[in-house]
């Protein structure tokens, strides 16, 4: 999935919102996932009592509580890998899962994050653990799209430029913003010297005010 998903209430996921049983395998999600008035937000599933395995997530997540890179709430999570940013969340936040069921089976999951733990803020060696980005990108089966990092600059719905970067490094210059009559323009205020996640950035136009 490459399209963004925004839900109004609980259970927003890049592949499935709520999965009571079954299996999701070999999926990728690159679309940002959000809930405006709910929780249970996940890169693959909002909440899952089935199995999620062999999947990859690179996106931004936001919502209330239970927000996770693979699942907001999960049960069986195997060999999944994430590079996610949680932009907004109140409780139960994790790079792999916001939280897991009491009888959960979690194994061989990895992630890269400067500030998140794996499951509700805690990581577990061999089960859900952090690795550096270079290690993440040498994991067997890594998709090409997962390891490619880039900033997409957009103005008035039109892509101005796509700028690649290396994890933890910056970009040399910002692209020129197309002029709009009667407005000043700027890109979002961001630390462009140390970038760790792909994202789309919208030009901000501000009308001139007369004295």
Give a label for each model feature.
Residues 151, 201, 211:
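A broad, low-specificity signal marking well-ordered, structured residues that form hydrophobic/aromatic
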Residues 151, 155-176:
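Solvent-exposed, low-complexity, repeat-rich "mucin-like" stalks and linkers
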Residues 1-156, 208:
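Predominantly extracellular beta-rich ligand-binding scaffolds that present long acidic/polar faces
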Residues 127, 137-140, 161, 172-175, ...:
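Compositionally biased, intrinsically disordered/low-complexity regions enriched for serine, proline
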Residues 108, 175, 198, 204-207:
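A detector of low-complexity, intrinsically disordered, Ser/Thr/Gly/Pro/Ala-rich segments
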Residues 190, 205-211:
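Beta-rich interaction/scaffold domains
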């Amino acid at each position: 999935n490459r399209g963004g998903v925004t839900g109004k209430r609980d259970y927003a996921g890049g592949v499935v919102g709520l999965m009571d049983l079954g299996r999701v395998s070999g999926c990728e999600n690159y679309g940002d996932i959000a809930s405006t008035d709910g929780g249970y937000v996940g890169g693959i599933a909002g909440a899952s009592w089935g199995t999620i395995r062999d999947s990859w997530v690179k996106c931004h997540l936001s919502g209330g509580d239970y927000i996770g890179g693979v699942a907001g709430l999960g049960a069986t999570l195997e060999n999944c890998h994430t590079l996610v940013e949680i932009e907004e969340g109140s409780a139960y936040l994790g790079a792999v899962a916001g939280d897991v069921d009491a009888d959960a089976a979690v194994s061989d999951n990895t992630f890269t994050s400067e500030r998140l733990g794996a499951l509700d803020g805690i990581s577990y060696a061999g089960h859900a653990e952090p690795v550096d980005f270079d290690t993440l990108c040498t994991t067997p089966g890594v998709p090409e799209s997962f390891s490619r990092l880039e900033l997409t600059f957009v103005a008035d719905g039109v892509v101005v430029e796509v700028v690649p970067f290396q994890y933890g490094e910056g970009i040399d210059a910002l692209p020129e913003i197309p002029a709009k009559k009667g407005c000043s323009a700027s890109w979002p205020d961001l630390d462009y010297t140390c970038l760790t996640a792909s994202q789309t950035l919208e030009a901000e136009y501000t009308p001139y005010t007369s004295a």
